[in-house]
Amino acid sequence: YHEWFDRRRDPDGDDLVSIIHPWESGWDASPRWDAPMHLHHPSVHETHAARDAHMQILHAYGHDAQKLAADGYFCVESVEFNAIRVADLQALARIAAILNQPAGVWTSRAAAITAAIQQKFITPGGIFDLSGPDETPIQVPSSAPFILLFGACIDPATAAALVQQLKSDRFWPTYPVPTTPTDHPAFVGDHYWRGNVWMSVNWLIYTGLRTMGYTAAARELAYRRLDLVEQHGFYEYFNPITGHGNGPAQQSWTAVVLDMIATAQ
């Protein structure tokens, strides 16, 4: 699996893998993807139509990341995708140790990706995804950088700065953590991926806070999640200001709130 990523999704050999469709990130219609998808202030319908149309492009290009990037199509080195990959490699190393198998191959890959994350994603101006062969920063704020905590792939100073940003009003409204900050022009609390609370994203941030030692912030986030579900029910995603649930009711992944509460004690 990881060899496939290295072979097929790292055309420039910099240890950061690329995604070639917004769906691969899970953040389907995030404002982060507007520019690389050649969208300008899109409607919900326009983002949906663009994602569907992009599938035809992928088929035409044989899902070749290098060719897609060269011709200006969506090919993005995603902050949280690479952070999650580091966490996965670290988990494989722990499994290998339990099985008395060599863990070095996993730890060395995790270390290489961590170094690339720190060198390329983290800049004085912010932490941004990189688009295309020129690695153009996508300067759209989001909660994706907080998932670097989950990968434990940042130094303590960067972690402290991220937590300070996380606890700001724009990311810590009545029901944190929105995918797009509440003061951003693209924020729409009830529109799909334009600034909602997603339990899956919040679980990654919560786990990252615990991993990096920010247990008080993690506990507060867990109990705010419980409050959200108690007041507004189980839904796919929520408005961070009103708590209004959107998408399918009884969405299964919202049950991660149980893990958050169980481990926040």
Positions of PLM-derived features:
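Extended, well-ordered alpha-helical scaffold segments
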Residues: 1-5, 88, 92, 99-118, ...
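Aromatic- and glycine-enriched pocket-lining scaffold segments that form the walls
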Residues: 1-7, 22-23, 76-92, 96
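Charged, solvent-exposed alpha-helical segments that act as regulatory interaction surfaces
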Residues: 7-14, 98
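Extended glycan-interaction surfaces of carbohydrate-active proteins
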Residues: 11-77, 112-197, 230-265
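Amphipathic, non-membrane alpha-helical segments in soluble helical-bundle scaffolds
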Residues: 75-83, 103, 107, 195
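Peripheral, non-catalytic segments that deliver or gate enzyme domains
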Residues: 78, 190-214
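Well-ordered alpha-helical scaffold segments within catalytic/enzyme domains
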Residues: 83-101, 147-157, 203-215, 257-265
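Short amphipathic alpha-helical segments
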Residues: 200-204, 217-224, 233, 253
